[in-house]
């Protein structure tokens, strides 16, 4: 029996992720009170529900501290448990709430008619969910569409052995560091294909760009140093019971250098480890 727990910021896409899991055959429950988690799982065991997906949000904030111990107990009983935390930057969340005209769950102050400003409600939610975020695999949805999020969540399910999965992500520093990054590597000092007229409108996925970068020894040096660093620490991450580790590689525009290195790293580590790739700026269009 396995279970995926979904938490995260309001407006970050938890419902989209839950729908993706439902499409993948999971028995899904939204907004389950944390104090009912263990009893709900016990209720489903006799009914042969092998895959459960449960979403919790900030409306259960007072009970969320109960969750880590319950998850440890479920793992001790032999259940495969994963925790996903969906996040997005504040500007994105403000825009999403403005577009949908929905009220943030923490907008109302207690039982009064007074309301918090939207930004204040979002920051309060971040503080309340901080511990849950620390214990989960974080997915930054700031720059991805609903269909892309569904596809990404489904791709996380492709590791039945529960071996540590490496997620390699390219990004542009000018658009911010991904919120879900465990390690960030800055490659802006490397030769930039952007300044080559015939390469400017291509990406790190294209062979001419790859050939240009391969011709510079410092690019290979950067690749080898990142590879050596990760290889040195992977077993320690396994001992720490990590399910996912996100390695973000950033350049100025997220089109050439970071994309090339993410492809190279995923190919190298993919020989021995489950790997996923994301090119944030390319996927954003």
Swiss-Prot record:
Name listed for the protein in its UniProt record: Nucleotide-binding protein Pnap_0906
HAMAP family registered for this protein in UniProt: RapZ_like
PANTHER family attached to this UniProt entry: RNASE ADAPTER PROTEIN RAPZ
Role according to the record: Displays ATPase and GTPase activities.
InterPro entries cross-referenced by the UniProt entry: P-loop_NTPase (IPR027417), RapZ-like (IPR005337), RapZ-like_N (IPR053930), RapZ_C (IPR053931)
Family membership noted in the UniProt record: Belongs to the RapZ-like family.
Cleavable signal peptide: none
Any GO molecular function: ATP binding
Ligand binding (GTP): 57-60
Organism encoding this protein: Polaromonas naphthalenivorans (strain CJ2)
Ligand binding (ATP): 8-15
Keywords associated with the record: ATP-binding, GTP-binding, Nucleotide-binding
């Amino acid at each position: 029996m396995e279970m995926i727990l979904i938490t995260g910021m309001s407006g970050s896409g938890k419902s989209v992720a839950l729908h993706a899991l439902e499409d993948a055959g999971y028995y899904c429950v939204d907004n389950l009170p944390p104090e009912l988690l263990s009893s709900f799982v016990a209720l489903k065991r006799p009914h042969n529900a092998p895959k459960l997906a449960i979403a919790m949000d900030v409306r259960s904030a007072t009970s969320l501290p109960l969750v880590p111990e319950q998850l440890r107990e479920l793992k001790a009983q032999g259940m495969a448990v994963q925790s996903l935390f969906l996040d997005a930057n504040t500007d994105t969340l403000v825009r999403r709430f403005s577009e949908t005209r929905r009220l943030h769950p923490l907008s109302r102050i207690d039982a009064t008619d007074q309301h918090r400003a939207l930004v204040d409600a979002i920051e309060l939610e971040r503080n309340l969910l901080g511990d849950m975020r620390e214990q989960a695999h974080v997915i930054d949805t700031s720059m991805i569409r609903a269909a892309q999020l569904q596809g990404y969540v489904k791709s996380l399910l492709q590791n039945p052995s529960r071996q540590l999965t490496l997620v390699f992500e390219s990004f542009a520093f000018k658009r911010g560091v991904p919120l879900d990054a465990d390690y960030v590597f800055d490659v802006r000092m490397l030769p930039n294909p952007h300044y080559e007229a015939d390469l400017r409108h291509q990406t790190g996925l294209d062979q001419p760009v790859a050939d240009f970068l391969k011709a510079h020894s410092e690019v290979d040096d950067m690749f080898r140093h990142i590879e050596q660093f990760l290889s040195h620490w992977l077993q320690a991450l396994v001992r720490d019971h990590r399910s996912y580790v996100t390695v973000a590689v950033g350049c100025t525009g997220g089109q050439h250098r970071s994309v090339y290195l993410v492809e190279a790293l995923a190919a190298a580590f993919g020989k021995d480890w489950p790997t996923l790739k994301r090119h944030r700026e390319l996927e954003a269009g």
